[in-house]
């Protein structure tokens, strides 16, 4: 069973760069699981920015909008999962899945990794939303809490600075 490191923060907080920096300190085979399905110009720009950022990090990139538990990763590898919020949205809105199915998928992936660095969005509130959007926000907040409880280490990004919420990275990587 692998070690989970959770990197959380609001949009634009620097969480992706932080996660990439963590993975850059590791040895062995590295995978980048991209879950975003770019459907707007802004999303396409974000995907391109992330590709440029990780160009020199020797990742094997896997584009998987869902079913990350079945990802073709080498046992004992290091995996960056970018990101949990997109994965959950894809599973809920395209596949009829839920928080539980995503958590199980992440656990299945984690069982084959040495280290899994999972990126997620925090700070979303249900206020002003109803229906599917409110259900998604509740599910994401619940999933984030479960991942935080499961993680050996967790960082929260604020003003592009990482703050340790749990564990010691130096003991893991």
Tell me the role of every PLM-derived stretch:
Residues 52, 57-100:
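Helix-adjacent hinge/juxtasegments
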Residues 19, 50, 80, 121, ...:
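Residue-level signal for inorganic ion chemistry
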Residues 2-73:
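Conserved P-loop
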Residues 1-2, 74, 107-110:
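Catalytic phosphate/metal-binding cores of nucleic-acid and nucleotide-processing enzymes, i.e., regions
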Residues 3-7, 30, 77-86, 115-118:
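Generic beta-sheet signal
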Residues 27, 58, 76-77, 113, ...:
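Short, well-ordered alpha-helix to beta-strand connector turns
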Residues 11-12, 37, 85, 123-124, ...:
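Short, glycine/serine-rich, charged loops/turns that create anion-binding
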């Amino acid at each position: 069973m692998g070690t989970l490191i959770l990197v959380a923060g609001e949009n634009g907080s620097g969480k992706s760069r932080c996660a990439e920096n963590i993975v850059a300190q590791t040895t062995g085979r590295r995978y980048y699981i991209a879950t975003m399905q770019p459907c707007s110009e802004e999303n396409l720009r974000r995907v391109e920015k992330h590709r440029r950022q990780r160009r020199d990090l020797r990742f094997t990139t896997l584009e998987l909008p869902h079913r990350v538990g079945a990802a073709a990763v080498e046992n004992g590898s290091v995996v960056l999962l970018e990101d949990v919020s997109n994965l959950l949205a894809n599973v809920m809105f395209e596949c009829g899945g839920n928080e539980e199915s995503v958590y199980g998928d992440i656990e299945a992936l984690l069982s084959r990794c040495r280290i899994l660095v999972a990126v997620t969005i925090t700070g979303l509130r249900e206020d002003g939303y109803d229906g599917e959007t409110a259900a998604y926000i509740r599910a994401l907040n619940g999933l984030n809490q479960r991942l935080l409880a499961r993680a050996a280490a967790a960082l929260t990004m604020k003003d592009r600075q990482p703050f340790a919420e749990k564990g010691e990275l130096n003991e893991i990587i």
